[in-house]
Amino acid sequence: MSNSRLLWSSMTVTAALMLSACSQPADETTDTNANAPAAETTGKTIRIATEGAYPPFNYTNADGSLAGFDIDVANALCDQMQAKCEIVAQDWDGIIPGLLAQKYDAVIAGMSITAERQEKVDFSEPYFANTMVWLTNTDGGFDPMAIKDATLGGQRSTTPGAYLQDNYEGKEGNTVQLYDNYDNAYLDLKSGRSDAVLAEKVSAKSWLAENAAGFGIVGDEIDNDDNIAIAVRKGDSLKADFDKALSEIRSNGELARLEQMNFGQ
């Protein structure tokens, strides 16, 4: 849904500083601040938007609280940066416009890096890599290798949605139906109003966990270099702060733990 690198150039130090550094014993030159949070984020409140309707990445509990992998990642990053997370729900179509309007500081919502989005926002390093799958009624005869005269569902403004439009809309008698969220796409699949839904694998597996009877994933996974990252406004220094914090929670095993907890992988 839900791939650039910043190359930082180092300043040349003065000869005096070089001599001073060389005069110290090796055990005194260890960088004790390597894991320290950026001064700009310590004690800061960072407002983060998520969708709240894309399990297991993000969803809304019965009591209105937000949960899921994205929320766990956001909290882990804020802990690493010694900042306070304030996470708010925002509908998907308005999530980038809300960021640009400064309603919040970042988007952590299973958002894929795309060229179109990169024209509007900056992305952190990826924190998850996705593949897409076909989800269908197993008794319906849907064949992903020969899709014809089918109604195909997905979510608008997402990587699977764009893939459906680019590859199937108006071709071989196929119709693409895009929805505001995947909940509605899955409802139409369950009611028989669509033949298949193209979704990210983890989202499809999450839905199948409660709707396995008569439904399943068919065909091969579609790997289209779908990397999920954090969106911030163009030129915002938060990108570097998030990149540093992501590197830390990846190296200390916290990111892998959150993946296992939310996805079982």
Describe the role of every protein-language-model region.
Residues M18-A21:
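C-terminal motif of bacterial Sec signal peptides marking the signal peptidase cleavage site
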Residues S23-A26:
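Bacterial signal peptide processing site
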Residues T30-G110:
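Extracytoplasmic small-molecule ligand-binding "clamshell" domains
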Residues I46-T50, P144-P160:
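Short loop->beta-strand "edge-of-pocket" segments that line small-molecule binding or catalytic clefts
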Residues G52, F128-T136, D183, K205, ...:
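Periplasmic-binding protein-like
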Residues T60, A74-Q82, P160-Y179, L208-A212, ...:
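Ligand-binding cleft/hinge of the Venus flytrap
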Residues N75, D79, K84-I147, F215-I222:
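Acidic, polar ligand-binding/catalytic clefts
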Residues G94, M111-E119, Q165, K190-S191, ...:
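A ligand-binding cleft/hinge motif common to bilobed small-molecule-binding domains
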